[in-house]
Amino acid sequence: MVPWLGPDDPFPSIERALGPATGAPGLLAASADLLPSRLIDAYLRGIFPWYSDGQPVLWWSPDPRMILVPAEFKVSPSLRKTLKRVLRAPEWEVRVDHDFAGVMRACAQAPRRGQRGTWITAEIIDAYTSLYRSGNAHSIETWHDGRRVGGLYGVSFGRMFFGESMYADVTDASKIALAALIAHLREQGLEMIDCQQNTSHLASLGGREIARKAFVAHVRSAVAEPPIPWQFDKRVLAALTSPAETAAPTGTER
């Protein structure tokens, strides 16, 4: 049975999360609240919320866990060509934390293959905006001709980045933002991005699964490190335009 957490109840051990033979593998607990303090505690333990309107807040710690190592990011020839074009053209920009709430709302509205509705509820937007105000959530945004056309957002503690969602209004806009994030994290020496769940899109970009135990051990170490800076622009993309960067076709985004 999934435990119900009251306002002052701690998270149970992640080993108590439901297993693969259940209908909800990785489900750890449920609660009525999504307070910033609870959200921070969750991320520091390798736990994340994922639920829909009308449901209680559901907390997850799946095993295995999908991650992306920045050094293993794959760049397709077509994306490499796009990045070169973005670097040359002044109408293309990469902005950081310029419109965090707007990126979240755009992610909530983006259609997802095989999904109805959105898990990015008004409550989720409020909670993550609070993390953004405290410097623990960030948006990486692709702009063209002064208009935001794609981006992503996630949570950051110490030397760990937890990816949440991305969207694109024009072709490759989300990939440009992700590539900029990857290039920046490479510069900073970050070793892992949490991707939460396995998708063909993430796998095509170099994502892979690791055991939950290994993931949580890395999180505990990484979040204890000093935070990295979050100021960069599209110039970081130059590091990904070498022909040595390779990749495969892409699929569904979260």
Curated annotation (Swiss-Prot):
Major site of localization recorded for this protein: cytoplasm
GO MF assignments: leucyl-tRNA--protein transferase activity
UniProt-listed NCBIfam families: aat
Gene behind this protein: aat
Residue ranges the record marks as coiled coil: none
Alphabetized InterPro entries for the sequence: Acyl_CoA_acyltransferase, Leu/Phe-tRNA_Trfase, Leu/Phe-tRNA_Trfase_C, Leu/Phe-tRNA_Trfase_N
Recorded family membership: Belongs to the L/F-transferase family.
Name of this chain's protein: Leucyl/phenylalanyl-tRNA--protein transferase
Catalysed reaction, written as an equation: N-terminal L-lysyl-[protein] + L-leucyl-tRNA(Leu) = N-terminal L-leucyl-L-lysyl-[protein] + tRNA(Leu) + H(+); N-terminal L-arginyl-[protein] + L-leucyl-tRNA(Leu) = N-terminal L-leucyl-L-arginyl-[protein] + tRNA(Leu) + H(+); L-phenylalanyl-tRNA(Phe) + an N-terminal L-alpha-aminoacyl-[protein] = an N-terminal L-phenylalanyl-L-alpha-aminoacyl-[protein] + tRNA(Phe)
GO terms of biological process kind: protein catabolic process
